[in-house]
């Protein structure tokens, strides 16, 4: 439904779906790394509850996975700064593929970048959008702000 000014009324993210090459391996990853609760599993599909977010996996074993690694495209989740070190340690203990983060200013807060077994990139980040905007407004005069 369109709202009064003709814009689509987006109410939020409905679900996240990831194409996976090995459903069992991916289920184990999402359960262990994200503590996602498995809701249903079929031959080619699994659905999870991730703190109220619907997460879906679809088995697509024949899809080439090499291109996904070249992009900065990722999904970022907010974590509490006090949990950063413990989460980083936990990911290491689970043998998760932790990526080198991009160079950043300390005002940009802390991040852990990592991939699932198929190369989908994720980030656990301690900052907020407001943190980022405040930093950019102060230190990046070349940027144009619309808010």
Curated annotation (Swiss-Prot):
Gene3D superfamilies: 2,3-Dihydroxybiphenyl 1,2-Dioxygenase, domain 1. One of its GO terms (cellular component) is cytoplasm. Its EC number is 2.5.1.-. The gene is fosB. Belongs to the fosfomycin resistance protein family. FosB subfamily. InterPro entries: Fosfomycin_Res_Enzymes (IPR051332), Glyas_Bleomycin-R_OHBP_Dase (IPR029068), Glyas_Fos-R_dOase_dom (IPR004360), Metallothiol_Trafse_FosB (IPR022858), VOC (IPR037523). The active site is at residue 123. Coiled coil: none annotated. GO terms for molecular function: magnesium ion binding; transferase activity, transferring alkyl or aryl (other than methyl) groups. It comes from Bacillus velezensis (strain DSM 23117 / BGSC 10A6 / LMG 26770 / FZB42) (Bacillus amyloliquefaciens subsp. plantarum). Its cofactor is Mg(2+). One of its GO terms (biological process) is response to antibiotic. Residues 12-127 form the VOC domain. Homodimer. Keywords: Antibiotic resistance, Cytoplasm, Magnesium, Metal-binding, Transferase. Signal peptide: none annotated. Metallothiol transferase which confers resistance to fosfomycin by catalyzing the addition of a thiol cofactor to fosfomycin. L-cysteine is probably the physiological thiol donor. It comes from the Bacteria. This is Metallothiol transferase FosB. PANTHER family: FOSFOMYCIN RESISTANCE PROTEIN FOSX, LYASE, PUTATIVE-RELATED-RELATED. It is found in: Cytoplasm. Mg(2+) binds at residues 15, 74, 123. HAMAP family: FosB.
């Amino acid at each position: 439904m369109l709202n009064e000014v003709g814009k689509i009324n987006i109410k939020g993210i409905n679900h996240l779906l990831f194409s996976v090459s090995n459903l069992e391996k991916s289920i184990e990853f999402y359960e262990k790394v994200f503590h996602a609760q498995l809701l249903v599993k079929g031959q080619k599909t699994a659905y999870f509850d991730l703190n109220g977010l619907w997460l879906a996996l679809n088995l697509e074993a024949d899809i080439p996975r090499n291109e996904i690694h070249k992009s900065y495209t990722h999904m970022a989740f907010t974590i509490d700064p006090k949990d950063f070190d413990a989460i980083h340690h936990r990911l290491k203990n689970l043998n998760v593929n932790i990526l080198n983060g991009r160079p950043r200013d300390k005002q940009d807060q802390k991040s852990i970048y990592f991939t699932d077994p198929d190369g989908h990139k994720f980030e656990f980040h301690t900052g907020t959008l407001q943190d980022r905007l405040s930093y950019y407004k102060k230190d990046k005069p070349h940027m144009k702000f619309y808010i």
